[in-house]
Amino acid sequence: MAISRWRIGLHIQQDGIYAIALTQEKSYSALRRWWQLPLEAGTIIDGQIRQPEHLRTALQAWSKTLPRRHQISLAFPAGRTLQKRLARPAVRLGESAQLQWVANSLARELGMSADDLRFDYTDDSVQRAYSVTAAQNSDIAALLTLADNLSLHLLAITPDACALQRFIPLLTPPQRWLAWRDATQWLWATRNGWGRRAREDANTLDELAQALGLPPAEATLCDAEPGGFDPWSAIARLSAPLPKNGAAWAVAIGLALGDA
């Protein structure tokens, strides 16, 4: 009998590590495991890895428990990314030339070397522009080195707020966008956008909506409480016990679900 591949969402937060493993069973996703791993204070500060050895130690024993057939989608802090929209050049470019043009244009706008950037982009044909998400190469390299040292099968590195977009089709009207929060920040997502705001910028969901210029009546919070969106409801087959602080796994769940 073939063993299903574990699809793992891994969200490294400032106060701990949250992970979940799903398998695809015919037309639905099934929960295999979830983990909450402690993280030494000061290891992650404002989304940046300050103590890589502490992070490696925190993940080492966990990594050895994973089956050989696994693939990991790893969260990257939205606060360490930059989103830009670049008007397309008048001349149609081939794929390689287009990639180089985006790299050079982005580097010029940021006043950085193209070699210091990692980026992904999509072509918005309606607006005749490229939507670009960029991060510092050193930040991405640190995660790639971590995964390599732990023999993790890394599938993707995705901005944490972007992972919340996986839940948008599951919202019940009039809800059209959602937010997640921890002690220091808000992450938010709509069908076409995502981002991060510091908690001092908004104390409540209504204040966040006002700051973003989004309709508060169409908002919901990733939360198991009545009126919120429970991210665990996106998994078709669950198995007890589930964590009491379930909202902390929202990003990890979105990553593990992917496009399934």
Label every PLM stretch briefly:
Residues 1-260:
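Hydrophobic/aromatic-enriched cytosolic interaction surfaces used to assemble or bind macromolecules
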